[in-house]
């Protein structure tokens, strides 16, 4: 075995063997065994889901670890950190456009989804590669003249966060659409739900790993961790994409063909009153649950005096609550519960979670803070699963990427 493809073949064989070992356990021990289908067997499905692990890793790094490190260890102003952490969200509205373009993409290679997933991978890799150095310049740890550093630092840090955010959004939108394309129609909701759970697993696992690696914080260790995450991004996404989407000669450009217009497709999608109400609910609910992202870890560090490792573990608590919520939601939905009602229950669970975080400071109770973080994750999980299931109900065959982009 030699050549540049050899490492990919080794990784592919390793992941496939592990997937088959899990498959041998039987459906009783694999709650997502029913997500597999003849067109997308479980080993291939689990390998494809690796792109969600990468997105979860980046989310844990940006929203969790780097958020606190910039404020507490590097001394960056909280409002500046809030601005940078919020930059990836600027690309979120374009997820719908990315999904639409991947629905109708034509290329000489005959792929629709893979070019967008690879584009997102390279954007995320580039952002992570330059991020630690940009943060040190932003914090003033540089030999550049002060006036120049004051300009270069914010620009470089902003570019790094924007690249990572754009990469995450692009990869996830096209990846979910590819999973939906490959799965049989009756298995699609379970496949996309599995992808969401994989995202949370990535957040839990990477949150714990970052907590362990940065227990004794040093600038050199931060560079190693962030750039290591960049390498992991490339490797896992390559393994995830390897031989997933078949090349189709019918997707090559045709002379004189008029490309579909995004505006017409969007107006057709939102013509349904239910779709409009759904988008409002998703927007407001997501804003409610994500407002805490930029302040939760610095709050634990500055107010409750928790270490970098302890606050990094909060990401694992949030994602762990989300994983539990998915199990509860799956049970409720399998018994015929209304998806929108499940999402509403998630919003209600979030209320005591935020209250616990607020009262943890005057009571000086770190355990109450952790409990609040877990409840926020649980509520967000119910909300996400409920709205995801509702989004699958809004989906049309020709608008798979558009519908998933709108949900994202």
Regions found by a protein language model. Name each.
Residues 64-80, 294-311:
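Short amphipathic helix-loop junctions that connect adjacent transmembrane helices
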Residues 1-42, 147-160, 170-176, 182-291, ...:
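Intracellular loop-helix junctions on the cytosolic face of multi-pass helical membrane proteins
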Residues 77-85, 153, 192, 306-315:
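Juxtamembrane helix-start elements in MFS-like secondary transporters
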Residues 80, 187-194, 310, 399-406:
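Cytoplasmic loop-to-transmembrane helix junctions
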Residues 170-183, 382-396:
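Intracellular juxtamembrane helix-capping segments at the cytosolic ends
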Residues 342-386:
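C-terminal transmembrane helical hairpin of 12-TM major facilitator-type secondary transporters
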Residues 117-150, 348-364:
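C-terminal ends and interior cores of transmembrane alpha-helices
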Residues 93-110, 214, 324-341:
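Helix-to-loop junctions at the C-terminal end of transmembrane segments
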